[in-house]
């Protein structure tokens, strides 16, 4: 860990806030050890932090879970560290009423992926903004992906600049991301068109009952749910 990052941790006003928690989800991916080393250092200098460690038996990427609907896939260092620590300490701004109203209209939300990178001057603002929305909206899920540590994922999704927000692998917004447009598109979309990957994410996060309610309200089983049930993995 860089000296500047260590000082940022030691000087953060929320360092001793009670009830500060995060979950480290490790996998067979070698980068799990990189995240584990960072978290161990963070624990050593953040006395009130409680870390739950779990291990997923797959080759997927390791993840830091910061609360319902919000995950950080990468190393929260450099420009990413300050917003990460603010979120840990519960210092998250309340989204505007207009945004909260749209969040409340969402039935099921597909996971948005926000790509950031070290030394990106505009990434901290996007990180804070979308973290606040994910934590405020029970049906909005955001995964912040460190493109520096996971370049293969950024390349696969055609990310050429940061910050970039990706929805459903097709829609993407870079730079100054239009929050209203993205939220409205999520709220107004047909939930029956969610992908199998999105439905799997809901089930893994303990939201199977919400998925069942959505299908009941729709009056039919979502096509991708059949694909999920018949997948060889299950």
Regions found by a protein language model. Give the residues of each.
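Structural micro-motif
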Residues: 56-70, 151-168
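Local sequence-structure signature of Cys/Sec-based thiol-disulfide redox active-site neighborhoods
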Residues: 2-40, 103-140, 223
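N-terminal non-catalytic structural scaffold regions of very large proteins
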Residues: 31-79, 93
């Amino acid at each position: 860990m860089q000296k500047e990052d260590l000082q940022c941790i030691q000087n953060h006003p929320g360092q001793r806030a009670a009830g500060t928690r995060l979950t480290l989800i490790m996998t067979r991916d070698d980068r799990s050890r990189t995240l584990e080393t960072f978290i161990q250092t963070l624990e050593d200098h953040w006395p009130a932090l409680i870390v739950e460690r779990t291990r997923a038996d797959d080759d997927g990427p390791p993840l830091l879970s910061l609360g319902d609907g919000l995950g950080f896939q990468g190393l929260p260092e450099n420009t990413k560290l300050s917003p990460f620590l603010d979120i840990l300490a519960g210092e998250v701004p309340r989204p505007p009423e207009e945004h909260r109203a749209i969040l409340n209209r969402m039935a099921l939300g597909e996971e948005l992926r926000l790509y950031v990178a070290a030394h990106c001057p505009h990434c901290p603002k996007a990180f804070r903004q979308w973290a606040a929305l994910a934590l405020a909206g029970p049906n909005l899920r955001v995964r912040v992906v460190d493109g520096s540590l996971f370049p293969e994922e950024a390349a696969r999704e055609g990310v050429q600049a940061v910050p970039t927000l990706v929805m459903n692998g097709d829609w993407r917004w870079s730079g100054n991301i239009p929050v209203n447009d993205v939220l409205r598109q999520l709220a107004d979309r047909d939930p029956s068109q969610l992908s199998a990957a999105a439905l799997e994410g809901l089930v893994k996060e303990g939201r199977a009952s919400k998925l069942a309610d959505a299908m009941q309200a729709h009056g039919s089983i979502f096509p991708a749910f059949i694909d999920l049930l018949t997948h060889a993995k299950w």
